[in-house]
Amino acid sequence: MKLTCVLIVAVLILTACQVIAADGWFGEESSCWWCTGQNKCCEEAQVCQSVNYACPPARR
């Protein structure tokens, strides 16, 4: 019974990791989902930074 529970939990964790990675939660698609307050999103450079500074050049 314990082995079954461990396997179920492992499958759920792996599935959650795949969903997170596929949805771009780590910034692959957009790095600005967490950019708030006195910050602005610089999509080309994939950074979030202060509104007081210009966006850096785009990443290659």
Swiss-Prot record:
The lineage of its organism: Eukaryota, Metazoa, Spiralia, Lophotrochozoa, Mollusca. Belongs to the conotoxin O1 superfamily. Probable neurotoxin. It is found in: Secreted. It comes from Californiconus californicus (California cone). This is Conotoxin Cal6.20. Its main location: secreted. The keyword Transmembrane does not apply. Keywords: Disulfide bond, Knottin, Neurotoxin, Secreted, Signal, Toxin.
